[in-house]
UniProtKB/Swiss-Prot annotation:
Top-rank taxon: Archaea
GO annotation, cellular component aspect: aspartate carbamoyltransferase complex
Record note on quaternary structure: Contains catalytic and regulatory chains.
UniProt organism field: Nitrosopumilus maritimus (strain SCM1)
NCBIfam families in alphabetical order: ATCase_reg
Name the UniProt record assigns to this protein: Aspartate carbamoyltransferase regulatory chain
UniProt-listed GO biological process terms: 'de novo' pyrimidine nucleobase biosynthetic process; pyrimidine nucleotide biosynthetic process
Amino acid sequence: MEQSELMVRRIKEGTVIDHIDEGKGIQVLNALRIDGSDGSLITIALNVPSGKFKKKDIIKVENKFLKDDDTNKLAVIAPKATINMIKDYKLVEKRRVSLPNEIDRIFRCSNPDCVTNSTEHIESIMDVIDKEGRVLKCRYCSRVLDVNQLKYN
């Protein structure tokens, strides 16, 4: 097969998440709760050869467009990812993910004694203290969180 040939078919409407760090595609699907239960066609390609990086993962989801919360999750898991919005088989928007200064409601604090894990139903707020290293800190209890062990709300 020539390199210019498509390995997976194009989508008519939806989102293509490209340049996902190698081996993170499944984690991205889980974090974004993309499982096909809504009837959307999902294509995932793992360990695809890449010019920029040695390998990458790609996810295509028909009839789904990411919300800001989804983009923030993606920025933590796969900081080099790009989000491509497709309409009528054409690229209408392309953007790189980037971490905001704070992330609200998406992740749970790993500290069992944190007020956000109490019965009071307080929404979590994570401050991004190092965008390059993807280091988050709970605003309520100051616990520094390992991005590889985050739990999603």
